[in-house]
């Protein structure tokens, strides 16, 4: 820093000497825009430049530059973090470990851990509780719900009880009901519909079935009616074949009777003429 100031002083002295040795010329006429700077103004500007120029920034760098960051580093830098480490770092976690760490978990274990299982709330207390809900208590309850109780209930719902109920709903009762709905009842009903009463069926067959063994030939009847008038037919024929009369009467409505009225009309005409 001192060498820089000395160089500036030498440079200023040299410029002053050279300016004194140069011959003075007439000054050119100044315009309105030009400013005449005196020596005092130049010196003031150079003095101001020493505060804001690059050299002054270097002077300020002692507070803001790397050196100042190193100074702050004692609080925030690596060294400061190591200092804070006494509370938050590994050492402090080890200190907190007495409450929450492995050691503390062992201490808490006295209430919830394995050590308590070896004491009042462990297997011994479970065995004590087991006297009510465990195997022994289940055996005690077994008198009502276990196998023994099921055998007792068996008298009503078991095999024995089913045999007793079987008198109503079992095989015996079904045989008793069989008298109404079984084979016997069907045989009784068979007298009306079954095979046991063939004579009744023959009588019933007379209404719907074939009463006579020889079927009448209705074509021959039509031929006879066309050739011989119905009134001139012998009485024996009317008596022997009563179904012919009914068929002829029915035939007049549905059958082929367009030829028969012609003979009847001629016969009626001859009878009228006679």
UniProtKB/Swiss-Prot annotation:
Residues modified as Tryptophan amide: 76, 100, 145, 157, 181
Keywords annotated in UniProt: Amidation, Cleavage on pair of basic residues, Hormone, Secreted, Signal
Q: Which GO terms describe its cellular component?
A: extracellular space
Molecular functions per Gene Ontology: hormone activity
Superkingdom classification of source: Eukaryota
Q: Which GO terms describe its biological process?
A: instar larval development
Q: Propeptide residue numbers?
A: 20-67, 77-91, 101-136, 146-148, 158-172, 182-274
* Subcellular location field: Secreted
Signal peptide feature range? 1-19
- Function description: Inhibits ecdysteroid biosynthesis in the prothoracic gland of fifth instar larvae, with maximum inhibition during the spinning stage. When administered to day 8 fifth instar larvae it produces a significant delay in the commencement spinning behavior.
Q: What is this protein called?
A: Prothoracicostatic peptide
